[in-house]
Amino acid sequence: MFSKAFLSAALLGAAAVEGHMMMAQPVPYGKDTLNNSPLAADGSDFPCKLRSNTYQVTEENTAAIGQSMPLSFIGSAVHGGGSCQVSLTTDREPTKDSKWIVIKSIEGGCPANVDGNLSGGPTSTGASKFTYTIPEGIEPGKYTLAWTWFNRIGNREMYMNCAPLTVTGSSSKRDEVPKEKTVEKRSANFPPMFVANVNGCTTKEGVDIRFPNPGSIVEYAGDKSNLAAEGSQACTGTPTFGGDGNTAGSSGSSGSSSGSSSGGSSSSAAGSGATAPPAPAVSSTLVPKPSQSSAPGVFVPTGSPAQPTHTSAPSGGSSSGSGSSSGSNSGSSSGSSSSSSSSSSSGALTGSCSSEGTWNCIGGSSFQRCANGQWTAVQQMATGTECTAGQASNLKIKATNLKPRMLHEMRHRKRNYHNHA
């Protein structure tokens, strides 16, 4: 009798000649020249499967903030599913240096929850259909959307299709596609996109990976038994590029932070012990600024620190953990950092803080924030900007004088941006 693994491998081999998968909706850039193969293993066509006329706009996709939009695929070689992300950049012709922010992660069952491949060949539309939503905190403007996929079975690959997207302001109730079935909402934040299998960091075969920084919206569409163990590494090796999204936040992924549960990550039938993977450490809202005043791909911090909200957990077996949550937050606002905070020689603060929402600008070139009772990791200011040093309730940002070479590069990028917008 053949094993399940053998049958899965046989199905994958039989479908190898049928190609792989492509994004159908939103309509990708250069649809006529896009093929269904993964990115090159050496990363030479990252991002967006670089080729001739990569960023030709076949059809401009439009989405309003808060509107649920379809995410669908064409093809049958789903390689046992896997995990996917939906990300945005303000660059309309992204490069390896572009900054991507994650607006949704799908851990397991993407693009389909099967053991091998689907039938139907490269024109099949039988893969699962998902949705994504442009969240609050994203400004109206022109973006590039990326769908990335890390397959569970087969060669270690990364798939990436990109699409032009115009984001409009939110509106009243409208016709929307159905909402996600099992979605985990976390503190509002937009972490960097995960990159692997093209940069020296390799994912493990046979599991649906958990993303180190999955972001605010996480959907679980696969079998719990296929999901990687909580706290496990998503990939091994040192990434040569795109490694910003490959490291978990300082809160870690062990589930030991306040408000997490020890034990399993599924909810019990009785409703107690429901737990969720931990939220990333940096919880201040990051807002993309696609305006002409800043270079494409720059994201400027703004808004108030968001509080984590757990609305659901992966479906499956009962949880072995207690599911207890301290639920406590520091409510005091003294205007200065807590005495338990420690300061480094660079001016960065670590540890707990009581001045919730306070910004700490370090030498004008980097910043951090008191969020959820802890100082966040230090982040660098965007090129061409600086902040006013010290602690304050608002982060004061101003433009700086740029070197002629930097100004030339920014103007060149802006010209390209508007020519293709």
UniProtKB/Swiss-Prot annotation:
Residues 247-285, 315-349 have a biased composition (Low complexity). Lytic polysaccharide monooxygenase (LPMO) that depolymerizes chitin via the oxidation of scissile beta-(1-4)-glycosidic bonds, yielding C1 or C4 oxidation products. Catalysis by LPMOs requires the reduction of the active-site copper from Cu(II) to Cu(I) by a reducing agent and H(2)O(2) or O(2) as a cosubstrate. Active on chitin but has no activity on other substrates, including diverse mannans, cellulose and starch (data not shown). Primary chain cleavage yields predominantly aldonic acid oligosaccharides with even-numbered degrees of polymerization. This is AA11 family lytic polysaccharide monooxygenase. Residues 304-314 have a biased composition (Polar residues). It comes from Aspergillus oryzae (strain ATCC 42149 / RIB 40) (Yellow koji mold). The keyword Signal applies. Its EC number is 1.14.99.-. Keywords: Carbohydrate metabolism, Chitin degradation, Disulfide bond, Glycoprotein, Metal-binding, Monooxygenase, Oxidoreductase, Polysaccharide degradation, Signal, Zinc. One of its GO terms (molecular function) is monooxygenase activity. Residues 1-19 form the signal peptide. Its cofactor is Cu(2+).
